Every structure is written in C-alpha cells, then in structure tokens.
C-alpha cells in the first residue's frame, strides 16, 4: 500500500488520460484501492431502479481515478507539483509543495494552514 499524500479537499490536476489538464477538488479518498474521487472528473452514467425512496432513472456521478494520474496544485504558482513532508519548529508535521516550499496542509487532523 502506497502512503497517500492527498487528502479530502485538496486541489489537484489530472496529468494523464481523457481528462488531462482538468482541475478539481478531491471529494473522497480510497486508500485501500489507491484511488480518489475528483469533482467533475471521470463522470459515468449510472442506471438506477425505482424504489420507495427515490424514482429510477439515469444519474451522472464521479467515478474514482488512480492517484498516479493526479498531481497537487502548488498554492503559490498554480502549477502541478510533488508533495513532501516537513516538520516545523513546533514539532508539527506538514505537507509542503516541492517546487515553491509553500505549506499545503497539516498532517493528522485534516486542517488547512
């Protein structure tokens, strides 16, 4: 299993495939499958049967995409970047954009800096 450097709410860009160049927010992360769901990317149509709670029909929803096909967006430059981990003076661990050194977010409590 790969250590995921992406969290829910991160801004990412698709780097390969049909949706190459599209930007979006991470809606959901599946660490077991190494996949993420990105808003507006990898849309599929799903046919649903009618039941007591909802009526049937065709709905469009996002499908998971492999993490190797995405890259973080550097908050300073807006370009794709790799992510590194760094410890601050107070001992907290943060995710940092490798290109600019800008802090992307803290590790552990999902709080944006």
From Swiss-Prot:
Short name of one Pfam family: KOW
PROSITE patterns: RIBOSOMAL_L24
Molecular function GO terms recorded: rRNA binding; structural constituent of ribosome
GO CC field: ribonucleoprotein complex; ribosome
A single BP term in Gene Ontology: translation
Keywords of the record: Ribonucleoprotein, Ribosomal protein, RNA-binding, rRNA-binding
Annotated NCBIfam families: rplX_bact
Quaternary state and interactors: Part of the 50S ribosomal subunit.
Protein name: Large ribosomal subunit protein uL24
Organism in which the protein naturally occurs: Rickettsia prowazekii (strain Madrid E)
Lineage, broadest ranks: Bacteria, Pseudomonadati, Pseudomonadota, Alphaproteobacteria, Rickettsiales
Record gene name: rplX
């Amino acid at each position: 299993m790969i250590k995921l450097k992406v969290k829910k709410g991160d801004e990412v860009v698709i780097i390969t495939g049909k949706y190459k160049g599209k930007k979006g927010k991470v809606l959901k992360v599946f660490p077991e499958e190494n996949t993420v769901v990105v808003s507006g990317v990898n849309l599929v149509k799903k046919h649903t049967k009618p039941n007591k709670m909802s009526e049937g029909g065709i709905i469009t929803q996002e499908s998971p995409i492999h993490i190797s096909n995405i890259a973080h967006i550097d908050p300073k430059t807006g370009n794709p970047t790799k992510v590194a981990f760094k410890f601050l003076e107070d001992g907290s661990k943060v995710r940092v954009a490798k290109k600019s050194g800008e802090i992307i977010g803290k590790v552990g409590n999902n709080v944006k800096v």
